Amino acid sequence: MGSLQAMRRAQRAQGPATIMAVGTSNPPNLYEQTSYPDFYFRVTNSDHKHALKNKFRVICEKTKVKRRYLHLTEEILKQRPKLCSYMEPSFDDRQDIVVEEIPKLAKEAAEKAIKEWGRPKSEITHLVFCSISGIDMPGADYRLATLLGLPLSVNRLMLYSQACHMGAQMLRIAKDLAENNRGARVLAVSCEITVLSFRGPDAGDFEALACQAGFGDGAAAVVVGADPLPGVERPIYEIAAAMQETVPESERAVGGHLREIGWTFHFFNQLPKLIAENIEGSLARAFKPLGISEWNDVFWVAHPGNWGIMDAIETKLGLEQGKLATARHVFSEYGNMQSATVYFVMDEVRKRSAAEGRATTGEGLEWGVLFGFGPGLTIETVVLRSVPLP
């Protein structure tokens, strides 16, 4: 009889988990930030609130977001007017939309990732899906697996309501699955649609106005696996390490509550400072085995959050100008797409590296960090190793 140790060795991959493909998608409806206040106050029947509209216009300008993609259109909102109210119970209307639309948008991103990966989708062994919205049974993971035609034997995991750090969290889980199940190929998908948080304006709720000004809709997918097949699978990054930390006594720093009116969000006005003051400890612990302590020596795949958070991180860590340029670019072109955003940044980093003739997928550097932060306050840190570019 074989030993348990031999059985366990046979189940584990030989090499580290790698990211083999990335795909992204957005709804077709593009909204320019300069004209969004007019749209928002018109569809919510709030054009008579002149002072509040001017305030919202200033908020939109300060985000430094240029444009966003959103599922909601004026036609949809006319059909479901409760969504335009500030406090009217409207959860059922919102839920009817997201349960159907989240898997559809996710499918677009997943198909792009699978196409780049280059192997049949029947070879996908695990599906990890995350979203802040669309809680249902069976969940969005089941619906996506059905839409894609994945094998009935695919191992599914659904993650709900984790918010902005969930993209990095999902990568940590995918790493463990790939390295502990030999031959596993993990399709990890994130999809965020802001239908549950869209609502009319109120003069006394700055946080709600900030959400209307900064959040966007998008989906992203990656294929993760270890021991890539030579000549078939072409890794983009190796996942060297992944960890999570919770900042003590920070529960009220940022969070959300699911109510009859949809999602309501709150955030501490010193959130940028809180993140900046705690990120270096996470970085130090993650990179200690590599002997790296100079943060300009690594490439950055960062969840942007907002402009103020990126400014605070740059200042605290002494980052060179341009270290977070890709995160800033993605934020300005798409807004904050919560868990999906960090994958848009990853996709942009590897594409820019190739376009600029860099030596590696990490802007010419070997080691990099992917990080996200969210309610808790939770910080996810992932150590990436780039691969050489031809």
Curated annotation (Swiss-Prot):
Reactions it catalyzes: (E)-feruloylacetyl-CoA + (E)-feruloyl-CoA + H2O = curcumin + CO2 + 2 CoA; (E)-feruloylacetyl-CoA + (E)-4-coumaroyl-CoA + H2O = demethoxycurcumin + CO2 + 2 CoA; (4-coumaroyl)acetyl-CoA + 4-coumaroyl-CoA + H2O = bisdemethoxycurcumin + CO2 + 2 CoA
Single GO molecular function: demethoxycurcumin synthase activity
Domain of life: Eukaryota
Biological processes annotated in GO: flavonoid biosynthetic process; polyketide biosynthetic process
Protein name (Swiss-Prot/TrEMBL): Curcumin synthase 3
Pathway membership: Secondary metabolite biosynthesis; flavonoid biosynthesis
Temperature characteristics of this protein: Optimum temperature is 45-55 degrees Celsius.
Enzyme Commission number(s) from the entry: 2.3.1.217, 2.3.1.219
UniProt pH dependence: Optimum pH is 8.0.
Family to which this protein belongs: Belongs to the thiolase-like superfamily. Chalcone/stilbene synthases family.
Alphabetically ordered keywords of this record: Acyltransferase, Flavonoid biosynthesis, Transferase
Keyword Transferase: yes
Listed InterPro entries: Chalcone/stilbene_synt_C (IPR012328), Chalcone/stilbene_synt_N (IPR001099), Polyketide_synthase_type-III (IPR011141), Thiolase-like (IPR016039)
Subunit and interaction comment: Homodimer.
Function: Catalyzes the synthesis of curcumin by condensing feruloyl-CoA with a diketide-CoA in the curcuminoid biosynthesis. Also acts as a demethoxycurcumin synthase by accepting 4-coumaroyl-CoA as a starter substrate instead of feruloyl-CoA.
Species the sequence originates in: Curcuma longa (Turmeric)
Active site, renumbered: C164
